[in-house]
Amino acid sequence: LLAKIPREYLQGICKIGIPTAIQGMAYCAISMVLTRMISGYGAEAVATQRVGGQIESISWNTADGFAAALNAFIAQNYGAGKNDRGKKGYKASLWTVGIWGLLISAVFICIPEPIARIFFHEPKAIATSVEYLIIIGFSEAFMCVELTTVGALSGLGRTRLCSIISIAFTSARIPLSIILGGIMGLDGIWWAISSTSIVTVSYTHLRAHETRRHL
């Protein structure tokens, strides 16, 4: 533990780890700003955001698990020169997680009220939660695909690309929330979060496709 770390190892660790660390810090900062904006709509809105995030974990925790496994799988096969095997693993993971995301989207959009009633009893809180689940439901499948694609790119050592895309589009939630919030109220903030997730995965998947073509 006290031995000197070789410089080339340290550089490699920092090259892969620092972009991801910055992305995590940026996401936390943006979430705090959005929470401050949401708090202006009352306690029900804040509660909906917090509980909604826990409900969403059904989809993103699953996708995150696949992303972690895919990261190791892609890195192993890329290092061994078995790029075709890595591509097959990515496609299989993408289909699995995509179908799961679509299922969660369908549940959120089609039966939001029974889900909301599990966590809330006040009519206003239930109504706010129902709107949240419907709007966020449109982005669940996209979010699952995004996390899986990020896992694949990270396995190739392209963490900087993933972080730049994620920070750029996640940051766009703030001005978009201000604009849509002024027009649609609280629902505008939900739409800002949902729409940026959809755009993020579209762009990330495009860059991943370009990366795979050059392997």
Cite the ranges covered by each PLM segment.
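Hydrophobic faces of transmembrane alpha-helices in multi-pass small-molecule transporters and flippases
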Residues: L2-V33, I58-T62, F66, L133, ...
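Short alpha-helical transmembrane segments in multi-pass integral membrane proteins
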Residues: L1-I18, I74-S139, L180-A208, R212-R213
